[in-house]
Regions:
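A cross-family phosphate/adenosyl-ligand binding-site feature
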Residues: 1-94, 102-179
């Protein structure tokens, strides 16, 4: 992770994926994080930048327009960009969570290029239809969507059908309560 470890969404993904709830040296060195390893952002020679490194997929979150453009054009100035290039080359799942708005034509073209190369572009736009009550609800939604896109099971409340079922149950309870 480059920058994402400091963001709420990055922290939520670490919690859901690896059970890491506190970012400290122990957690990030593998103590509680299992196989989690940190590399400096400029270490383009790290194992995860090699096609022989086995993994189930990669999420770039949050992805700036600069990072998106560099991935789209095969430019690898840092480890995140290099690992993303290798992920595409090896035909593994790559999800790019673009963070910027408004989206201009150059970003749209970069999104087209990475999509054609096999990536999924998932703008960081949370589902307001679930009627979030807090910023954490919005973060949970986006973390759950990103995990879904990688095929990772989770328990985050993001399903529309589950939300509808909860609404119906609440409505039944309101109507069955004597006034």
């Amino acid at each position: 992770m480059n920058g994402a470890a400091r963001s709420n969404l990055g922290k939520r993904l670490l919690a859901e994926e690896a059970g890491i709830t506190k970012l400290d040296a122990d957690a990030l060195s593998g103590g509680r994080g299992g196989q989690l390893v940190m590399h400096p952002g400029n270490d383009v020679g790290a194992a995860c930048a090699s096609g022989s490194f086995r993994h189930d997929g990669m999420v770039v979150v949050p992805a700036s327009s600069n990072t998106l453009a560099k991935i789209a054009h095969g430019i690898s100035d840092n480890l995140v960009q290099r690992a993303a290039q290798v992920t595409l080359k090896e035909r593994r799942p790559l999800v790019i969570a673009h963070r910027e708005s408004p989206i201009g034509l150059t970003e749209i073209e970069a999104m087209r290029k990475v999509t054609e190369a096999g990536a999924v572009v998932a703008p960081l736009s949370p589902g307001l239809y679930l009627q979030p009550e807090s910023v954490n609800d919005l973060i949970d939604f986006m973390a759950g969507r990103l995990l879904d896109l990688l095929g990772v099971d989770h328990q985050l409340p993001i399903r529309w059908d589950e939300h509808l079922a909860e609404q119906r149950e609440a409505k039944r309870e309101r109507h069955s309560t004597p006034r």
